[in-house]
Structure formats: structure tokens, C-alpha cells
């Protein structure tokens, strides 16, 4: 009996590509304040694995959860949604 496991995916913007085979992705989410009801934007920076160093700053990517690859890295970049515009 094999079970299918749902893989968590998030979408975010690459804010750093200075590390080898790793990018930092800023993931924003909107939550409602429990007391006042105002919609607040919260952000989280996640390190994700980029095997070929192909993603750059400003790219919008989809990351998916995987096994731990290092102390701080347990996500892998799965697809490119939008390439950053070059100036």
C-alpha cells in the first residue's frame, strides 16, 4: 500500500543569489490581525537549492519542500514563474 504525500509549494521572489547552488527566496503572505482585523503582509526568507545557478535576483519562482539538504536548506526551486527584467 503506497501513500501519496502532498508536497508543500510556495511562490516568492529571489532576493539573493550570492551563494553557490543556493538562492534566498522572499515569500510574502497576508494574514488578518486577530484583534483589529487589518490585513497584514508578513514575509519569510527561505534558502532554496538551485542546482545549476540559473536563477537571479528579482526572479519569481516556485519552491517545493524536500528533505533537509543542509542546516538551513530544505526547499528546492521547482520552476520559474517570471524572469526579472534587465535594466
From Swiss-Prot:
Keywords: Ribonucleoprotein, Ribosomal protein, RNA-binding, rRNA-binding
CDD domains associated with the record: Ribosomal_uS17
UniProt xrefs under SUPFAM superfamilies: Nucleic acid-binding proteins
One annotated GO biological process: translation
GO cellular component, one term: cytosolic small ribosomal subunit
One MF term in the entry's GO annotations: structural constituent of ribosome
Subunit structure: Part of the 30S ribosomal subunit.
Function noted in UniProt: One of the primary rRNA binding proteins, it binds specifically to the 5'-end of 16S ribosomal RNA.
Family: Belongs to the universal ribosomal protein uS17 family.
Protein name: Small ribosomal subunit protein uS17
Protein's organism: Neisseria meningitidis serogroup B (strain ATCC BAA-335 / MC58)
Higher taxonomy: Bacteria, Pseudomonadati, Pseudomonadota, Betaproteobacteria, Neisseriales
Name of encoding gene: rpsQ
Amino acid at each position: 500500500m503506497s501513500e501519496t504525500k502532498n508536497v508543500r509549494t510556495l511562490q516568492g521572489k529571489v532576493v539573493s543569489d550570492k551563494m553557490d547552488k543556493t538562492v534566498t527566496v522572499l515569500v510574502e503572505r497576508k494574514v488578518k490581525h486577530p484583534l483589529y482585523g487589518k490585513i497584514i503582509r508578513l514575509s519569510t526568507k527561505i534558502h532554496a537549492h538551485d542546482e545549476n545557478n540559473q536563477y537571479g535576483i528579482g526572479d519569481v519562482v516556485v519552491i517545493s519542500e524536500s528533505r533537509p539538504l543542509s542546516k538551513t536548506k530544505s526547499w528546492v526551486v521547482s520552476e520559474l514563474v517570471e524572469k526579472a527584467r534587465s535594466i
